[in-house]
Amino acid sequence: MGSLEVERKTVGWAARDPSGVLSPYEYTLRNTGPQDVYVEVMCCGICHTDVHQIKNDLGMSNYPMVPGHEVVGEVVEVGSEVTKFRAGDVVGVGCIVGSCGNCRPCNSDIEQYCNKKIWSYNDVYPDGKPTQGGFAGAMVVDQKFVVKIPDGMAPEQAAPLLCAGVTVYSPLNHFGLKQSGLRGGILGLGGVGHMGVKIAKAMGHHVTVISSSDKKRAEALDHLGADDYLVSSDAARMQEAADSLDYIIDTVPVFHPLEPYLSLLKIDGKLILMGVVNTPLQFVSPMVMLGRKSITGSFIGSMKELAEMLEFCKEKDLSSTIEIVKMDYINTAFERLEKNDVRYRFVVDVAGSKLYQ
């Protein structure tokens, strides 16, 4: 099919200001070019990053903004040069919809670190047209940033994997932490953390969930299958667990001290930061030096890793624990997410919702 020159309108739910309240918003999609895929959205997960963006917590939000970067939909049309997809395919779109294609990260298949990457929303294309996300009827996306959802995987289960799943999978893959028998810690048991437990267990790791309270102990051990549970304020138990973990995946999106968790790592252990925190984190250097420990970070994952992760989850029969809601519930869902009142990811049934009020 050739380039689709006609601009088409769609309806999304947009924030207009830092109040973060979403309401229906009609806008025009960019033209569908030869390399583009036109996708009708089926569902979209809600990520904590969406909260930061709609409320301008990072100081770089532009409005109107249609959030959503855990998007699953059906391909309706493809451009003349599209080779990866055809009409009827169920596909996913994650956090990024473009990159320069020429830099070292792009040439190394880690395009998520490209300095010119284009976010799925709250960004602009090279022609100046704003990007809008997946809480909408449709999207137009370059085929390079679209991934096939494996046959048999439910769309609503696949959606959170496009961010939460690959965010955990990527550092385990990159840092050589996929082999069976490792001992890992998951700090924070939210949308990303619960997938961390599931993926690490599927890789054959001994998994310890670390939390600030005891309230999620039964959930972590009985439902998610974690092997141990630590309350960070329990000094005796934290001391017993010192020098026991090969890595910790830190998913906490608010300020917290790092020293208690560095003490849990073995020599050469890694504390991998994933939560978006606006205030400086603190630690004393001997905590790192005396154990040759590393504090590092990881950001989502590449398109290659995204495809690998989806196949891994299909093979291991892994899925997100979700609550499905309609679009008219989205503001309540955001309020609940800010209170950590979700088990563990909201997914909006976009196709089954009335987008106009």
Swiss-Prot record:
Residue numbers binding Zn(2+) 2: 100, 103, 106, 114
Note accompanying the cofactor annotation: Binds 2 Zn(2+) ions per subunit.
Keywords: Metal-binding, NADP, Oxidoreductase, Zinc
Highest taxon in the source lineage: Eukaryota
Residues bound to Zn(2+) 1: 47, 69-70, 163
pH-dependent activity: Optimum pH is 8.9. Active from pH 8.5 to 9.4.
SMART domains on file: PKS_ER
GO molecular function: cinnamyl-alcohol dehydrogenase activity; coniferyl-alcohol dehydrogenase activity; zinc ion binding
Activity regulation as described: 60% inhibition by 5 mM Ca(+), Mg(+) or Cu(+).
Catalytic activity, reaction form: (E)-cinnamyl alcohol + NADP(+) = (E)-cinnamaldehyde + NADPH + H(+); (E)-coniferol + NADP(+) = (E)-coniferaldehyde + NADPH + H(+); (E)-sinapyl alcohol + NADP(+) = (E)-sinapaldehyde + NADPH + H(+); (E)-4-coumaroyl alcohol + NADP(+) = (E)-4-coumaraldehyde + NADPH + H(+)
InterPro entries reported in the protein's UniProt record: ADH-like_C (IPR013149), ADH-like_N (IPR013154), ADH_Zn_CS (IPR002328), CAD-like (IPR047109), GroES-like_sf (IPR011032), NAD(P)-bd_dom_sf (IPR036291), PKS_ER (IPR020843)
Any Pfam family: ADH_zinc_N
Summary of the tissues where the protein is detected: Expressed in leaves, mainly in peltate glands.
Functional pathway: Aromatic compound metabolism; phenylpropanoid biosynthesis
Function comment: Involved in the production of citral, a mixture of geranial and neral with a strong lemony scent. Reversibly oxidizes geraniol to produce geranial at half the efficiency compared with its activity with cinnamyl alcohol. Does not use nerol and neral as substrates.
Subunit structure: Homodimer.
Listed name of the protein: Cinnamyl alcohol dehydrogenase 1
Name of the coding gene: CAD1
